């Protein structure tokens, strides 16, 4: 399963390259959507900007989900639903198909801040928040293909759901400890 993509909440984490481009209505030149190519796992994503509603609850779920966006000043805010259940981390924090994600894209010159806020009523007791900075690199039409090699990274018993009892999660304050917060 290692070459199968993570869900969208984890797709932007780590070193990667991605592209964003506009999809315009040919008659009006209004932006209908932003298309996103995420080099890791070669995923293509659409962020609909035309005001369309999210599909009904029983509609198919995908690793990339169904996304709609709106501009608030200089910030693009994206809401994603219909995300296939997967994991938030390689260590095994699971996600459910009730996961929703709100993203904020904020550009500062050649830097792009990407902030996600994930809610999951099944597995999360509070929102999962993560952020990452990207640097604009002008490489013309060059992009990398994702070469996947299968390796056993985290051996897991397929009959168990990874979990920690209340107060026993060793990852709860890992970032605070690492950065002395």
Residues covered by each model-derived region:
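PEST-like low-complexity, intrinsically disordered acidic/proline/serine-rich tracts
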Residues: 1-181
């Amino acid at each position: 399963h290692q070459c199968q993509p993570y869900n969208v909440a984890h797709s932007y984490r780590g070193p990667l390259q991605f592209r964003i481009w506009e999809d315009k209505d040919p008659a009006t030149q209004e932006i209908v959507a932003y298309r996103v190519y995420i080099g890791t796992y070669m995923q293509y994503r659409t962020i609909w900007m035309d005001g369309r509603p999210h599909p009904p609850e029983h509609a198919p779920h995908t690793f990339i989900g169904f996304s709609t966006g709106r501009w608030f000043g200089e910030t693009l805010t994206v809401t994603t639903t219909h995300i296939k259940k997967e994991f938030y981390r390689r260590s095994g924090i699971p996600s459910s198909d009730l996961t929703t994600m709100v993203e904020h894209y904020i550009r500062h010159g050649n830097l792009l801040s990407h902030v996600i806020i994930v809610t999951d009523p099944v597995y999360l007791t509070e929102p999962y928040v993560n952020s990452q900075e990207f640097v604009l690199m002008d490489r013309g039409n060059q992009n990398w293909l994702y070469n996947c090699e299968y390796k056993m990274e985290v051996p897991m018993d397929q009959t168990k759901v990874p979990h920690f009892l209340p107060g026993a999660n060793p990852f709860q304050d890992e970032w605070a400890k690492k950065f002395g917060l």
